[in-house]
A protein has these predicted regions:
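Ribokinase/PfkB-type carbohydrate-kinase core domain
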Residues: 1-10, 71-85, 95-148
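Glycine-rich phosphate/adenosyl-contacting loop at the front of the ribokinase-like
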Residues: 1-59, 64-68, 74-78
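A general structural signal for well-ordered alpha-helical segments in protein cores
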Residues: 40-44, 66, 91, 104, ...
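Short, basic and Ser/Thr-rich N-terminal targeting/leader segments
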Residues: 50, 88-91
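Short beta->alpha linker loops
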Residues: 60-61, 89, 140
Length: 148
């Protein structure tokens, strides 16, 4: 079976939802969840669950959060052979929701993906071109999106 390549984000998603009406500019009691996410990561896990061979091309840091991404992918049978380990922190998304679950604000720091440069992507382009399918998420730089 040919491999499906996913190029883009693998991140840590941190979400919070208050128990009651959210009070702005104040601390609110509620629930906070931390889990592995990112567009490309999430799609890769779903495809692997359908028993496709999946390769995630991303960039992650070297700390605790990177370990969470690696463990998530390993458990899901998602290959990280072409994922870069970088000095920066792993991409992070923070979402704050209201008591009904509607988003109040989201902040995304996916700057680690700046390491997926056209030069790096050119080194794995033969594998990508030979794949059954390549899915690219919109978190890459414009230059990398144009290259692919």
């Amino acid at each position: 079976m040919q491999t499906i390549y996913l190029v883009g984000g693998a991140a840590i998603d941190i979400t919070g939802k208050p128990e009651n009406v959210c009070r702005e500019r104040d601390s609110n009691l509620g629930k906070v969840q931390i889990r592995v996410g990112g567009v490309a990561h999430n799609i890769a896990k779903r495809l692997a669950a359908l028993e496709y061979d999946v390769e995630l091309v991303s960039a992650i840091g070297s700390g605790f959060h990177a370990g969470m991404v690696r463990e998530s992918c390993q458990k899901a049978n998602v290959s990280l052979q072409h994922t870069l380990a970088c000095a920066e922190h792993t991409g992070t998304y923070i979402g704050v929701y209201d008591e009904d679950g509607d988003m109040l604000v989201g902040i995304s720091d996916m700057s680690v993906l700046d390491n997926l440069t056209p030069d790096y992507l050119s080194s794995i382009l033969p594998q990508i071109n030979a794949s059954a399918l390549c899915v690219i998420d919109g978190n890459l730089t414009p230059a990398s999106l144009d290259y692919l």
